[in-house]
């Protein structure tokens, strides 16, 4: 069995995005993929076969004030507007949608690691 874990780390996980692009370029596959936070986004794009998708999110879209800004922080308490990232940009009709059909048909097991916010 081959497995991979991407522990995320917000925008620091651009490194992970590059690693998954390398895996796609070289046909590397895994039986299980574990993702935490931003690592889930990297793995979703990897399993959907969308090379360079997350790199563009980190380098192109992140420059938009809707994506990441002090205004977001003042309005919502979060520097990054995750509704914009995972809704507006990534949904089926978004600017750069995740290929859900390919993701769902990928035989790899995708395990998302999360904790309940109030109890841990």
What role is predicted for each listed range?
Residues 3-93:
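Patatin-like phospholipase
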Residues 75-120:
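Active-site-adjacent alpha/beta core region of enzyme catalytic domains
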Residues 1, 29, 106-109:
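Short coil/turn connectors at secondary-structure junctions
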